[in-house]
Amino acid sequence: MNFTETLQSLTGKPLSVCTNQELYLALLELVRRKSADRVQPVTGRKLYYISAEFLIGKLLSNNLINLGLYDEARDALAAAGKSLADIEEVEPEPSLGNGGLGRLAACFLDSLATLNLPGDGVGLRYHFGLFRQSFENGVQNEKPDPWLTAHSWAEKTDITYPVELAGKEYTARLYKLAVTGYEGRTNTLNLFDLDTIDESIVHDGIAFDKTAIDKNLTLFLYPDDSDEAGRRLRVYQQYLMVSAGAQLILAECAARGCNYHDLADYAAIQINDTHPSMVIPELIRLLGEKGIDFDEAVEIVTKTCAYTNHTILAEALEKWPRSYLDAVVPQLMPIIEKLDTLARTRTEDEGLAIIDKDDRVHMAHMDIHFTHSTNGVAALHTEILKNSELHGFYELYPEKFNNKTNGITFRRWLLECDPALTAELEQHIGSGFRKDAAELEKLLAFAEDETVLNELTAVKKANKQALADWLLHTQNVTVNTDAVFDIQSKRLHEYKRQQLNLLYLIHQYHEIKAGHLPAVPLVSIFGAKAAPAYTIAKDIIHALLTLSKVIAADPEVSKWLQVVFIENYNVTAAEKLIPACDLSEQISLASKEASGTGNMKFMLNGALTLGTMDGANVEICQQVGEENIYIFGQTSDQVIHRYAAGDYCAAQWYEGDANIRRAIDFLTGPEMLAAGHAENLTRLHDELIHKDWFQTLPDFNAYVVRKGQALNDYACDPLGWRKKCLVNIAKAGFFSSDRTIGEYDRDIWHLGQ
């Protein structure tokens, strides 16, 4: 049967009379069958990538591309008068992640399958994700983000595992979601849930009874931890994930002939950040039940497990009060105590203990002591870990530390989300970059070719128009496509410094009012969610929404400046924003961003980076050269020194600089107060003057100058700008997750061996 006949056999009627929902379900079933054909037997070592998040995005187009069916599906549907793009709108986006951590995990699964490596994900089947963001009266509101339907990519299985929480046994059910590689194998994302979850207990936004564990355990990713019940619920979640996951791993390995003593020959377990850390004592406990003594179990688990550190922020290195673990996982505490005792025989440094003097259990410490590898996710990040944040551990275990710079899957972030650029590239350098991202370097041969540069300009212009159409349709916002599209889309956090961008926009507002007109209009686009209990982050959102209203109401300013905040930013929105971006905002405080991957996605799609020397920005700069990126601000060494000296006083910068003072005071000026809420604006105003922990003010003037240079280059040297864009695309190959996964496999996992 041809494609049309196959699809009609699934719908039971001609495609032309099918609804988009019927066609979506038929395509889902077709993809499932084709994916199943690519499942391969596992020999040797298999990876289990355990992560609290998998931000996989919509899957229909991605799977059709990876299976080589996209063009066929699009054409068959078009012949029946149907649009694949319209059918994609029917698909709900899975609410299984939030930020870069979860998106990285999703890219890694894609690359594992594409490289024909045996590697499955292990996580939780959240019903409502983080939350669905809406803006009401200028503030962020949170609601459930439902995505589970009767027909989902994640298929229910009959496989269950008992999990003991607070002395009570729960039954974890396994759901399997097929992960299809590009011209590669099919792996699996294993997601655990409870049959007893009750979605109806959620009320008043995202409030629910945090003590009703049987009903609430997998409702939300990262339950609000502003109270003790929420913090304990996170421990419950983490143990459900690792206990069910560990039982799955042991069962699968045993089915392949493992006798448990040789577990490390059958499994490689990657602990993605500290959320899955309890897999270490849980595996030791389960191996003990198989008759393996403690010392051997520790040796087996250490050889099997590896840990990825994703943060330099101390607040994000999880430390649970012992009382929580005593209450929720009492079966693990004797094991954790023995691990702490064993760790103390290796070092006298109290700072490296697992259980500290305040009776807190340090998850990252347990990970480093009892895995065989600890990696950072960008060269700078790993050096900071070794020389600063985890220096004591590096001195104790230098052989464990290594770097694996993050990457992104080009299948989603180029082939799927930017088909126009993909076609343009294939016209000039062939299609080899689809599997070998390094082939993008061939584009450098066209760096002086005005015809090619003009074609790239046309692609970007079309993508900007497509984004403008989408913004009008989904956000009811009209934007000027002749303006520079300046985009900062990432989790809302003070260290990522959306507040620096905010102060710049206020500065520009004043400059325009004073008659100092910019070289080109600017549309500044934000996409970000703030954690529900993160007050200042929500205040930053409010300030940006309020500023947007103030500017829109001022015709003198609005023709030069516009602020747009995307509601409910997710992967689908990112796929619209990234191809249309001119200037990519990567402005975290140097030394604070472990890597970042948004910077890579924007670069790949021909945006230029405005950024600090932080995270993977450093390596982007090395790849493209300083002339093809806009770097500003303090270095990581300068920032670390300033923290060590303890002498940063934001008030001195505020008092000593008229531009800074004007920008901050505008937050509580009459224009903003008339459009916004005094409580939110005053709190942010005071925070910037009296705290500013992430050093916004010392970098402010350098940011204003560098951004001005970028906008002038765009306006005054369009061909030079486009050449810089071409170089960025050509040098993006290093940031493929295929390269990253190849390095993990070579140095840590040794899969299939």
Describe every region a protein language model picked out.
Residues 1-753:
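A conserved ligand/cofactor-binding region detector
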